[in-house]
Amino acid sequence: MATHTVQPRTTKVARAPRRGAASRPPGQRALVASPTTWFVWAGVAAFFVFLVGILVSVVVDSLGRSWFGSWLPEQFTFSWYAAAWERFGMANVIGVTLLVAVTVIVISVLVGVPAAYLLARRSFPFKRTISLLFLLPVLMPPITYGIPLATVMYNMGLGRTLVAVILVNLVPSVPFVIMTMTPFIEQINPAIENAARMSGARMRIVFTRILAPLLVPGILAAAVLVLVRTVGMFELTFLVSGPQSDTLVVAIYRAMTAAGGGESRPLISSMAVVYTVTMMIILVIALRYISPTQLVARVKDSRDD
């Protein structure tokens, strides 16, 4: 009689997930505390401590009545802001800064977007050379072409005027919009335009009613970058501006280098705080209405369509 040997059945016990792995989203790696990781985080922390320390020192200096040989001023006051507002005409300076920035944005978009469309959709001789020429004002230091520009402005009788400030800031801003919008337009499916043309739509209708809504995220992103660049542009503005056409960053420099050793340090710090707050407001508004993730997603959707 044959006997059958029954092998004992072995069951695999599922290994319990490591602590914290269940709560981690799929595809996300755990932070490994390697020496390189600690070194990177230490560098980031040191940078932020240094940056925050500078900002705090400027703010405290703008609020201190007297600050000599101690960690904090003896008294705090807002009178330096009122004095700087009256002394340097901050209302006019901020108004000029915003006027220059908005004008440069509008002209740069009106000129740069059609030019970017031509570079993205049309083939013509010396196209690559023209694209490289547009890159030069963006890549070169502003002072290298700022001095010849200033010479031209003064020879034309536009020196120390608001018109000159706007014109010189357009030189890097228009190519910047072109270089920003060209790859953005290239990602839009050309079949959308071809379908509209086959339906009898003219080029103006195609551009304003079909392409324009798709280009809005890219235009807003380019406009914000031009805004930040124009407000912070010192070299070109300084070379052609005057007392009534100084932007905020140039006004700060003139206050620091005024005759007699410059203005009081708390006054300069007050102007620096106003400039920093202005730039922060611009960035907050930009991040509020422009999301890089949504911008890329919208371009991808239009490409897939």
List each model region and its residues.
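Transmembrane alpha-helices
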Residues: 42-43, 48-55, 178-181, 189, ...
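Membrane-interfacial helix termini and adjacent extracytoplasmic/periplasmic loops
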Residues: 25-30, 69, 78, 126-127, ...
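Membrane-embedded alpha-helices of multi-pass transport/permease systems
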Residues: 53-56, 60-63, 110-114, 147, ...
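Amphipathic cytosolic juxtamembrane alpha-helices at the membrane-cytosol interface
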Residues: 37, 99, 125-131, 194-221
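Interhelical loop and adjacent transmembrane-helix boundary motif
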Residues: 30-36, 66-69, 81-89, 231, ...
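Hydrophobic alpha-helical transmembrane segments of multipass integral membrane proteins
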Residues: 91, 95, 99-111, 115, ...
